[in-house]
């Protein structure tokens, strides 16, 4: 493992720039700087940003809060991608402006599915037997 890599294999620089992009996007969306009716009426959480190794592409994972419709929010974000890219480029100092790709964050759904499975009485019983 290289000195500047995390155990997952991503460099610290990629993680740092990804966090800067995430904070910039969160700030833009929270302040309502995007003039879009859908984005104005939905609270959107930017959960993660994964940068490509050359920092030219950013995959942005978002989750609408309060049960908002993911498809409508993703479509609105994709419609406003050019504005968001220019704002992020202005706030995050990198050589190139990253192209943003918006995807729905499925990790919360996967986590709740695993939680439901672990609460299933038959599985809980098996887990208790294994612990003994």
UniProtKB/Swiss-Prot annotation:
Gene Ontology molecular function: any one: ribosomal small subunit binding
One Pfam family this sequence matches: RBFA
Location(s), subcellular: Cytoplasm
InterPro entries: KH_dom-like_a/b, RbfA, RbfA_dom_sf
Entry GO terms, CC: cytosol
Superkingdom: Bacteria
An example Gene Ontology biological process: maturation of SSU-rRNA
Keyword terms, alphabetized: Cytoplasm, Ribosome biogenesis
Secreted is among the record's keywords: no
Main location group: cytoplasm
Protein task: One of several proteins that assist in the late maturation steps of the functional core of the 30S ribosomal subunit. Associates with free 30S ribosomal subunits (but not with 30S subunits that are part of 70S ribosomes or polysomes). Required for efficient processing of 16S rRNA. May interact with the 5'-terminal helix region of 16S rRNA.
Subunit structure: Monomer. Binds 30S ribosomal subunits, but not 50S ribosomal subunits or 70S ribosomes.
Homology family: Belongs to the RbfA family.
Name of the protein described by the UniProt record: Ribosome-binding factor A
Species in which this protein is naturally found: Rhizorhabdus wittichii (strain DSM 6014 / CCUG 31198 / JCM 15750 / NBRC 105917 / EY 4224 / RW1) (Sphingomonas wittichii)
Record gene name: rbfA
């Amino acid at each position: 493992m290289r000195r500047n890599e995390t155990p997952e294999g991503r460099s610290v620089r990629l993680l740092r720039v990804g966090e800067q992009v995430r904070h910039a996007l969160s700030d833009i969306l929270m302040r309502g700087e995007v003039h879009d009716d859908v984005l104005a009426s939905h609270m959107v959480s930017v959960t993660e940003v994964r940068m490509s190794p050359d920092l030219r592409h950013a995959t942005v994972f978002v989750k609408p809060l309060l049960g908002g419709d993911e498809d409508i929010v993703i479509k609105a974000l994709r419609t406003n991608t050019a504005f968001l890219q220019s704002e992020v480029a202005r706030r995050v100092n990198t050589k190139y402006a990253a192209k943003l790709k918006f995807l729905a964050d499925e990790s919360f759904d996967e986590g709740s599915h695993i939680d439901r499975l672990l609460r299933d009485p038959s599985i809980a019983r098996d887990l208790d037997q294994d612990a003994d």
